[in-house]
Amino acid sequence: MSGLVLGQRDEPAGHRLSQEEILGSTKVVSQGLEALHSEHQAVLQSLSHTIECLQQGGHEEGLVHEKARQLRRSMENIELGLSEAQVMLALASHLSTVESEKQKLRAQVRRLCQENQWLRDELAGTQQRLQRSEQAVAQLEEEKKHLEFLRQLRQYDEDGHGMEEKEGEATKDSLDDLFPNEEEEDSGNDLSRGQGAAAAQQGGYEIPARLRTLHNLVIQYAAQGRYEVAVPLCKQALEDLERTSGRGHPDVATMLNILALVYRDQNKYKEAAHLLNDALSIRESTLGRDHPAVAATLNNLAVLYGKRGKYKEAEPLCQRALEIREKVLGTDHPDVAKQLNNLALLCQNQGKYEAVERYYQRALAIYESQLGPDNPNVARTKNNLASCYLKQGKYSEAEALYKEILTCAHVQEFGSVDDDHKPIWMHAEEREEMSRSRPRDSSAPYAEYGGWYKACRVSSPTVNTTLKNLGALYRRQGKLEAAETLEECALRSRKQGTDPISQTKVAELLGEGDGRKAIQEGPGDSVKFEGGEDASVAVEWSGDGSGTLQRSGSLGKIRDVLRRSSELLVRKLQGTEPRPSSSSMKRAASLNYLNQPNAAPLQVSRGLSASTVDLSSSS
């Protein structure tokens, strides 16, 4: 057994045993030592028995004792070897356990490294997104500041329409240029008898009641944006008229005008122009070249060309319409003044400022002589003429007109101009002089600087825009305090215009809501040819200096027309007698639907005023 152990120890020194080989050899040695221990144990027992026998006989006792001692030492060595082998086996088992734990820890370390890399990637992506977001926020803030600056620039030349603007009054070209307005509905049967008789005397014709009903019905459908119903309705009526009355009948021309209007509201300008040209040919052949209906169609065709930016083509049409109205109505009729305003607009878009001044001055003279100096058309025409002066650099003439407008509005409000009641521009100039003598304390009450703020009660779209335009003119002249006064007054006027009381006062001041005055002064919003068809001059200055194409009437008239015509239509369909109009009958939708957000903008518009151009160039 000992030889086996020695043989294993004599293996070549250069051969390194693996851990498994060491463990196997240790187990073999341990087994050999156990066997050797058992063998020595048996020999020791035999010697002990021999010693007992020798003690009885007394021979060779010392030799036996010596062998026993050697055996005991050998057994002690064997037991020590066994203990060491057991320790080695236990150590090997512990090392195996430690190695297993080590592998587990390594696996965990690998997973943690992967998770750490994932977290780093996620953090890097989040940081990039955060950086992009911060850049976007900074860019949006810059764009916001830029837009706010542009908005402030536009305030010097924007179109201030107060509450009417919110209700849709600022539509570029409303339906009233082809359809009957409030005056026709108010007159009722008197219209068909009076105007019909006049039409008969002058060789005109009277529009049948069925076409009037169709007018109002198409208005309702168009107001609701239901063109898919309005267009087939017009086409069917047109086919019926052509079949029963013939292609050259005036009623066919009327229906062509209605269908052209619907196409125009859909931005189908080519189709609308084709229909209006057909209507013009029919009316010229049936009613004569100098009939008011021909002038109405010419005006509507000029409107269409103006929308497309064809000012040169529109100007001769508008000029011919003016000649017809001068011949039929006289050179001093208010409707001639409206046509002059339209012609001035077309000329201004072509840069013909001398002609623009001539047309505006003539229109202003007609309004003042026929309607009086307090008529709102006078203020609007003065404002338009002042804007024309601004575009030519005639600042003194423009300033004088602006002051006339504000003074007239002030007189209508307070009755006179005295020390206690001064127009707002006088207060502005006084504050300018005071600011030059001593700086104004921003916290001081307004009473210290006079009652200028009381003049802010004078409010209308025309006056409001005049305040802003005159304020811009003051800024050009370096009168900053005066400009701020007018701008603040314009802001107050705009805020006051949002309540019904202020709106009523504005209507009373400028006569925009006075029906009796409109009847006495003549048609202020439209020109109707004999027979009752409306041929209003829809394209004219808005009266605020913006130079946009806009109808000068009020949407309240359209609402009343729609309300009454709707009730009449319902009564006719039900076969009952018409009753007085009920206040509960309302129009189905607002005319704002006609100005769709994606609709092409009106091209016939004025450029910015000179003050705004300078502000834009300086920025």
Curated annotation (Swiss-Prot):
Q: Could you tell me which PROSITE patterns the record lists for this protein? A: KINESIN_LIGHT (PS01160), TPR (PS50005), TPR_REGION (PS50293)
GO cellular component terms attached to this protein's record:
cytoplasm; kinesin complex; microtubule
The record, for SMART domains, names:
TPR (SM00028)
Which residue intervals correspond to the TPR repeats? 55-88, 211-244, 253-286, 295-328, 337-370, 379-412, 464-497
Where on the tree of life does the source sit, at the highest rank? Eukaryota
Coiled-coil residue spans: 65-155
Q: Where is the composition biased (Basic and acidic residues)?
A: 156-175
Which residue ranges have biased composition labelled Low complexity? 609-619
Could you say which protein family the record assigns here?
Belongs to the kinesin light chain family.
Q: Cross-referenced PANTHER family, in alphabetical order?
A: KINESIN LIGHT CHAIN (PTHR45783), KINESIN LIGHT CHAIN 4 (PTHR45783:SF6)
Stated name of the protein: Kinesin light chain 4
Name of the gene: Klc4
